[in-house]
Each structure stands twice: as C-alpha cells, then as structure tokens.
Amino acid sequence: MLLGGPPRSPRSGTSPKGPWSSTGHVQFGKSPQTWPRRTRPRSPEPAAPSGVRGSTWTRRRDSPRRAGPTALSRYVGHLWMGRRPPSPEARGPVPRSSAASRARRSLASPGISPGPLTATIGGAVAGGGPRQGRAEAHKEVFPGQRVGKMAAPMELFCWSGGWGLPSVDLDSLAVLTYARFTGAPLKVHKISNPWQSPSGTLPALRTSHGEVISVPHKIITHLRKEKYNADYDLSARQGADTLAFMSLLEEKLLPVLVHTFWIDTKNYVEVTRKWYAEAMPFPLNFFLPGRMQRQYMERLQLLTGEHRPEDEEELEKELYREARECLTLLSQRLGSQKFFFGDAPASLDAFVFSYLALLLQAKLPSGKLQVHLRGLHNLCAYCTHILSLYFPWDGAEVPPQRQTPAGPETEEEPYRRRNQILSVLAGLAAMVGYALLSGIVSIQRATPARAPGTRTLGMAEEDEEE
C-alpha cells in the first residue's frame, strides 16, 4: 500500500499536512518470527522529504489515522513503518519486553488517547495489574515494622486478693483498677511472694519492651503513653480537681489507712498479719510481715512528721478527725453520680475506690473510721458498683467454680506438704551445721571409766609375781 494515495475506507482520510511524497510499506499479518527467510537484499531507508519536519515515524504518528485506539490496539506489536521488515536472522533474538516496550511507546504518543483495551495494556505493563499491585502492597514492610512477630504483652505483678477484693494492697488495687477502667491488655500475675516479682516489690509492670516499672504513678504514666488514658475526656477544670483530690487523699486519708491496718495493734494481729502469714510461703511468713510493718511505720512518720511519744494519742485523734472530714467531702462531691466526673470512670475513681474498698471490705475489730464510712451510703454504693461492674468474680465473696478443680489441686497438695517437710528438715540441718562449725556445740568421745577395785587387784597381782 502506497502512503499518500486516495483513502481506501470511509474511516480513513487525507492527512491535514497533504499527501506524503515518500513511499512506505505497511504490512499487516503475523509476527516477523514466522515469516520465511528473505533472499533479496534490504531496500534502502527512504529519505525524509524536504519541507517536512521529523522522520517518517513521526509523521505517521501524528496522522489522524492513528486516532482510533480500538483499531490500533489490535495491531500493537504487528505494525512496521517506513521499510520492509528484516528477517529474524538479521534482527537476532527478540527480547520478551519488546512488545511491552512498543505498547508503552504507543501509549506515550501524543496522538493517542488510551481506550479501554489500551488502558488495560498500560496498567499491566506499568503496574503489573491490579492483582499484582495488591500482592506487592501486602509484601511491603515499613521501617520499624516486625514481620511475622507480635509484641509481647504487658505483665502486671500485684498482691493477691482477699476480703472480697481483687487485691489487699493499696497500690496494687489502684493500678489494677485503673487498668480495668482503660481496658489495657495486661497479663496479671496475682502473687503473695514479692520475691517472684521482677523488681522484688509489688506492684510491678513489665512492659512489652522488657522494661520493669515498680512505682504506681509511673505505671499509670506508662499506660497513658500506651494510649490507655482514663482522663482523656476531662476538661481543664476537671483535671485540676483530680490533682486537688489526689493531694487530699494522700494528706488526709492515707495516714489513717496506714495506721488502721499496720499500726493499730488489734487490727494488725487479727487481720493484717494473719492474712499475710497465711498467704506467704514458708519461711517468708515468719519475718516478712514484720518487715513490712516497719516500712509502713517509716512511711507514716514521713507523712505526719516527727512527734513525741506522749503526743501519740492526740495525734491519732487529729488524724481520724481529718479523715472523717475527707470522707464527707468525697461523699458531697460524688453526690448521686456513678463516678466523680459523670458516667465514665477516671483516674481519680481508681484511687478513691482503692482507699474506700479496703476500709469497707476488711473485717476490722477496731474500725473507728469504718463506722463513719458505712454511714455514707453513696460511697458504699459507689464501691459496690465498681466491684460488680469491673471485678465481677475477683470482688465476689464466692469465686467461680473451675472446670477441673480436682485434678491440679489434688496433685499439688501432697507435693506442697512434702516441700514444707523438706524445708523444715533443711532448716534444722543448717542450724545444726552452723552450731557445730561455730563451736557452740562440740562432740567429745567419752573414755570408759574403770571400776574402783580394778587398780587394787592389779597391784596385788604384781606383788604375787614378784
């Protein structure tokens, strides 16, 4: 077909630039790899006509005959312009991406607007298709992202429960309540041996990165950094009220709470020391409750300051009077609300609950402040509501039945008794060994005593022999 001649179809037309002076060859058919081998030499490359800018390919590209994407897309990879196609031997091996590169060049031509089929080809070449793009998106890994690994959960070590509470320790109960309010994903270990904690004290938090935090307010600060913040919706005024009431609790209510459980002789012997002695393993139950009492006495001295022994009775009356005023103020601030700042709990509710629940649930023989607290009905209902809502089984008097309670308990009972007996024997052996090594106890071999007439009889026998 000679270019520049009259159009052969209604769709074709004369180029707006006029008929082309050079002749070219357009051949539609099979791929050049299937053509027979040529025997005659190649025809020379036709020179571009004078007065026309660009090569034959550029002029052919700008022709309006190439404006139809549907007609062109069928022949992508089978169209050669300007000269006869060479033989496969002369061209050499064709790379696999030749058809894709030709399609990409045809799509980049300014005279072609991509149609449905052209857009599909371009998407397959450039992006690998929608399925491949989604597959590659799933394989993408961002900086700092762990592939195939999940972060270790946070672990909270706290004192075990008693008296109908999830924990009998003030700090442990406050941290545990705050975690329940925020829904923090914690793996809770309720233990009665502080030496099993990673820090040696309770409560303690082991973060997902392995860091150990043992101070209660630092534990709560870490939970807030992990986006578990119970005070997120509080206003500036409510935040200021939280700080004010927290200071009031530490200054007015905490000294009386320490005095009630650890200093008052009757309460300490019949309630506090009894619970810790029964919960702790041997031999910690012999000396650890007394050590904890001394620590709380030092803490109370820091809170109240130094005072003379004769002023202890007057100081105790003053502390209990201020504590009753603090409870009355809390009752007035709570009113008929579910929580101190509305229908959602905050950090203040966690600390107030930990203070009030210990006073309310423990069966104290000497409960001066407990009587006043039970007279404030809204505070009692407040504690009961939190226990039933956030600790339905931990705070209940009757714990839920286990599915297989007989198996592990019956197996552990003889081993527990055996361990206790072995511990006692090991302690006795250590004491006896220490006494022998230090010289407190010495073992001497006893010489046999001779009878009184033995020496006289021996002397008589010697005289007879002489």
Swiss-Prot record:
Protein task: Involved in transport of proteins into the mitochondrion. Essential for embryonic development.
UniProt keyword list: Isopeptide bond, Membrane, Mitochondrion, Mitochondrion outer membrane, Protein transport, Transmembrane, Transmembrane helix, Transport, Ubl conjugation
Species whose genome carries this gene: Homo sapiens
TM stretches of this protein: 421-441
Disordered as annotated region, ranges: 1-133
PANTHER family reported in the protein's UniProt record: METAXIN RELATED, METAXIN-1
Biased composition (Low complexity): 1-19, 90-110
Lineage: Eukaryota, Metazoa, Chordata, Craniata, Vertebrata
Membrane topology, as annotated: Single-pass type I membrane protein
Main location: membrane
Cross-link named Glycyl lysine isopeptide (Lys-Gly) (interchain with G-Cter in ubiquitin), sites: K187, K190, K227, K317
Name of the protein this chain belongs to: Metaxin-1
